[in-house]
């Protein structure tokens, strides 16, 4: 489903595509530092999103396994951003594993509260999910580093 985002030589090979994407983010961390940019935006990925709806029932531990894998993939990237003194803002977005405050908190927990984990806030995504976009600011203001308005 995500092949269209990668160059042709990485399509139809999820392992190679994932490695390419990881390398692109590592380059982005370095480029951000070179440009004097202190915050960078990204999406989290969607390992568990397709299983969000509770029917049919998902296997026990699926969400735990997905967030464990998500953090395994992101920790080296977060560490690279940290070594370049750049925060990484995850856009809270339907279709992504980080799609609300609770999933952001879960990711934060699985990354051991990594200091570079921040949030891009776009209230339109909250409206689509019928979430209270104003209280989100009160609760997560310390993590909001970028905003789409």
Predicted regions located by residue number:
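Short, structured active-site "lid" loops
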Residues: 1
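Active-site acidic/histidine proton-transfer and metal-coordination neighborhood
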Residues: 5-119
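Short, conserved clusters of charged catalytic residues that mark active-site
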Residues: 23, 72, 128-135
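Short hydrophobic/charged patches on amphipathic alpha-helices used for structural packing
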Residues: 29, 134-137
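Active-site glycine- and acidic-residue-rich loops that bind
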Residues: 95-101, 124-133
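Core-facing hydrophobic residues within beta-strands of well-ordered domains
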Residues: 114, 143-144
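Short, conserved loop/helix-junction motifs that constitute active-site signature segments
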Residues: 138-142
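Conserved small/polar residues in nucleotide/adenosyl-binding loops
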Residues: 148-149
